[in-house]
Amino acid sequence: MIKQNNKYWLPLIAVIFWGASFIATKYLLDELTPETIISLRLIFAILLLSGIAIVQKRDFSINLKSHGYIFLLALIAVFHLWIQVTGLKFTTASNTGWIIGTAPIFMALLGLIFFNEKLSAIKIIGIIVAVIGLLLLVGKGNPTNIDLIENKGDLLVLSSSFTWGIYSMVNKKISLTYSPLMTILYLFIMMAIIIVPITVNDTVIKSVYNLTITGWISILFLGLLCSGVAYVIWAYSLREMESAKVGAYLYFEPFVTVLTAWLFLNENITVLMILSGLIITAGVFLVNKDW
């Protein structure tokens, strides 16, 4: 049993893994295609989560009616990851960390459009504030500098925030009766079924065979820790703590990304980037808060 005080550190561990995941992915993009990275990440995560499920003697039976729902979520999740990883090829890990954090903005807007969920005045202000921060970040201080070609990486990552908003909306409306562990395991299996067959070829097999030590460390980190351990920790934390308290830890994720990108990728930490990031975070905070 985890001590009462120690449980508050667990969500932070998950957030540290997720924040550092962009650095590991950035390393891998020098050796593998986005599709290969996603496929390997899923395979290692499935192996770990299956092992945990077996040790815990979980029920692996699945309701056939759930297949369509899980397939839909998996399809969205695969596309989300693909444009995120592809975008990371053309932008910095630091920018990616800040931009990914805007997903709640899209969730709020999609909730308004499709489910008539009301936006308070403060939430609208939060959206405006976050957009200002985004424009400053992507435009490097001048929104008129934003170019579809030059900033394609940032814009692809932003698109992945939008797809995560769609995923969250669909997930919210779908009622699945499985435990968090089995839900994420079934989702990963379905995602692997979608992406692995269209990824594997002779060139991919050769690139995996020639993967460097750094590459293997990176893919194991992504699969076992970021997609495996972190999800288990997060599910445990949500069960043991209030959702709002657990969710608050996510505000630290971009700061972890910026710090680890500086340490391992030699990315610069500029005043403008930190200021833009803080503005984005403030806007997202206003949107997330129940006023």
What feature does the model see in each segment?
Residues 49, 71, 122-140, 195, ...:
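Hydrophobic transmembrane alpha-helices of multi-pass small-molecule transport proteins
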Residues 49, 107-109, 113, 145-204, ...:
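Transmembrane alpha-helical segments that form core, pore/gating elements
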Residues 17-46, 92-95, 166-190, 205-208:
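Juxtamembrane helix-loop-helix junctions in multi-pass membrane proteins
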Residues 17, 21-22, 50-100, 136, ...:
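Specific transmembrane alpha-helical segments of multi-pass solute transporters/efflux pumps
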Residues 38-40, 82, 96-102, 170-192, ...:
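Helix-helix packing/entry segments at the starts of transmembrane helices
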Residues 28, 37, 41, 87, ...:
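Hydrophobic/aromatic residues within transmembrane alpha-helices
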Residues 1-36, 147-173, 193-195:
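Glycine-/small-residue-enriched transmembrane alpha-helix faces in small-molecule transporters
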